[in-house]
């Protein structure tokens, strides 16, 4: 018998189709290095995703458009942080060149 059982999982999501999609997306996230929300009994990412769904740590976002907006905002923040870091590195290089020319 599968652990967690399909019956307990279907209490957490509206349909078995939603369960499959949520489980697959979470398994891909875990394989891509996303931080886990708990300790697992399972080794496989697909079963780990089901464990997280069963515990209630992973849920379907109630408003898909808000989820997309939050993902876009996170990606934009990461892009801006990367640009700022690159700008600081370029400034540091320019400063070191100036200091080297003064000597």
Swiss-Prot record:
EC number annotated for this UniProt entry: 2.7.7.6
Keyword Transferase: yes
GO biological process, one term: DNA-templated transcription
Keywords: DNA-directed RNA polymerase, Nucleotidyltransferase, Transcription, Transferase
GO cellular component: DNA-directed RNA polymerase complex
Catalytic activity: RNA(n) + a ribonucleoside 5'-triphosphate = RNA(n+1) + diphosphate
Signal sequence segment: none
GO molecular function, one term: DNA-directed RNA polymerase activity
Listed transmembrane segments: none
Domain of life: Bacteria
InterPro entries named among the record's database cross-references: DNA-dir_RNA_pol_omega, Pol_omega/Rpo6/RPB6, RPB6/omega-like_sf
Quaternary structure (record): The RNAP catalytic core consists of 2 alpha, 1 beta, 1 beta' and 1 omega subunit. When a sigma factor is associated with the core the holoenzyme is formed, which can initiate transcription.
Stated role: Promotes RNA polymerase assembly. Latches the N- and C-terminal regions of the beta' subunit thereby facilitating its interaction with the beta and alpha subunits.
Protein family (similarity comment): Belongs to the RNA polymerase subunit omega family.
Record PANTHER family: DNA-DIRECTED RNA POLYMERASE SUBUNIT OMEGA
HAMAP family given in the database record: RNApol_bact_RpoZ (MF_00366)
Protein name (database record): DNA-directed RNA polymerase subunit omega
Species of the source: Streptococcus agalactiae serotype V (strain ATCC BAA-611 / 2603 V/R)
Gene: rpoZ
């Amino acid at each position: 018998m599968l652990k967690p059982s399909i019956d307990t999982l279907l209490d957490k999501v509206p349909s078995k189709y939603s369960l499959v999609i949520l489980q697959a997306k979470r398994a891909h996230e875990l394989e891509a290095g996303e931080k886990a929300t708990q300790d697992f009994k399972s080794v496989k990412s697909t079963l780990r995703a089901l464990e997280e769904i069963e515990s209630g740590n992973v849920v379907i976002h109630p408003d898909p458009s808000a989820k997309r907006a939050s993902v876009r905002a996170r990606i934009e923040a990461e892009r801006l942080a990367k640009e700022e870091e690159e700008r600081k590195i370029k400034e540091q290089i320019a400063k070191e060149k100036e200091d080297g020319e003064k000597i």
